[in-house]
Amino acid sequence: MEMMNMKVLFIVLNSEDHLDDLLIKFDSSGIHGGTIVNSLGMAQEMVDHSQGATFNYIRGMMSGGRPQNKTIFLVLPAEKLDTAKQCVREVVGDLNGDNIGIMFDFTIDNVEGLTK
């Protein structure tokens, strides 16, 4: 594939509540392809595997919480990056609140196996 200015956008959703709506919004905005991975926050994993009274207390507090996150990554032309980010903001809302998620991007220097 001819290399153009490409980006990878990572979105970690702490709740699956918005996943279907986000995928529909991506599709209607011309954002196609991507990968969705089940993921787990490091704090949850540490609590699950740690010993001691403090961790037992935290484990009890977190037991009713979300077991997994959804991590979406999209490889897309740089000119579609802002569109993809806006889709996330419109569907998920402000990511700066507590336990909503995180979104970040990187420039890609090389891609193999990506089809149009």
State where each predicted segment sits.
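Positively charged, small/polar-rich N-terminal and surface patches that mediate targeting and assembly
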Residues: 1-116
